[in-house]
């Protein structure tokens, strides 16, 4: 850092204010990431590929920003840039959400889905300013913290460990460091890492457990915006920068006034769904729910994906009668999802039927009761707010018919309703000869190669549990499974039972269930098709390919450029950054594995999922704090030992998850609740310990070292986020992903040991 600039930071900005500013970065980054993630998923009809693209772009861009931060050592006025960047990261999230909602239907055709290439480019462009600024600030903060670490004869309450003697003189243009300067630089990297993660913990707790329940995304983002503007003003005042201080204060006041006067959530939502009347929009813990009304039809949309529409008589009647016609005398019917669309009431046409309707999102139920009271207000409909799979696992009731009216398996969470393990759980709650029904993919007279794979996998997975499987090609492919008899003569059964229908009648069924269409479906079945399992979700991957097949996938200069840059970067990684890269990849990959394991074991319980993410951030903070205290006694071999510890951990994870999943013991089931959060904490502690130690082992100067390590960490995490959930787990399975993480960390440990000899 320029000598005059160093003096300004040392003498003018107190360390508590500097670390408060870094903590505010962490709060802002975590809240912004979660809010933007949900907005982007909604804007681009998010499946897990979109999730991976968004998170991968976020990590990659922040890593690039950190790499650019090494130029901070040449700045003449770093405080001014520090304040300006903090103002920027305060305002950009609100602007990003506004632009995303208003420009989505300007850049792309309204109502159309954006392809993969368009999504990658859009996410990259939208997130680039914020992520680059955040990454740069982290490196700049490391430099500021290094200059402000006290000498032993300058005691302070904030000193974490003793450091060396006073900073020695530096010759003009020289790169020589005294021992004291080196120790200060090494310490600063770990301290900034700790306070950044502390902010992430606070942001995660606030977002997950408080703000999301009471505020829109705009309302949530106002909190970190005002916080960052306040800290920017405080830093500017401390540094006697009057103009930036006044600007920060005025912007904070203006933002508060604008929030009070204008409801940006209402304004942008109406622009986003122009042509339809938005009758409700809001955020629940499970996503963004929008309800529009068009010509008397209500459309429920969650995270950009249509949940259901009212007056869709064809879909409602097919969903109900293909299944119920198999057992017209059914008394107990379980309906998982979709009941508010009219399916629950349609089931009541069968005189003996009583319906248990299970819906995960309480907001969907609340809005449906408000807008569609006639659909659920009946003493024969029992509404249960729970995760469908968890309910099936825990219920002691027996059902004659189980109808899963869920979307296609576009995410690993939804895929849980299409696995062999779930089908086996349903089998246990079915009465003898009971029927399970669900639909998968559309049928318009032609079965594509991608759709054929979906059908074959679903049929073979069902056949592992049920004696009989029947597929009826309606507007969608309806799967029926039972140990009893199944018949395609749906029209005969409906007429014999005297059930009135509006569309699904004999003429309709004769047109749909023709011998040719039935033969087309049978033709794609295969005894060699893979089986969809909890920890090997191949059906989700095939659905992803089915979704991608709807677009013209172009691998253009943008994607090629990213790949080339990444390959060059990986080829040039030295041992210490390689350890951080491997740890970042393992952290991202194994966190996805643990979240998947928790959802499989205990269902999608939002607060618990939020707890796991918060525990991960907490573990990073604990690990970095612990290593900062023992840093003087640790060296290169300890970094290799941490990489080996992550290797061993990675090898243990799949076997622990499978043991917890297969055990029928109530004690093991009880232990599994805290087990996964504790496993997450342990993983994060190991990864968090690596970063400060790498800052010491690979130290050159503060800017270069911080930039290099943050870049390696974020790029490793970006690859883990992008590849693991979208490709590696669906194709290879959980065990292979854990082996890959173990192998990468074993390689980094070996390189570290060999290079140190």
Pin down the residues of each PLM region.
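Alpha-helical transmembrane segments of multi-pass membrane proteins
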Residues: 1-757
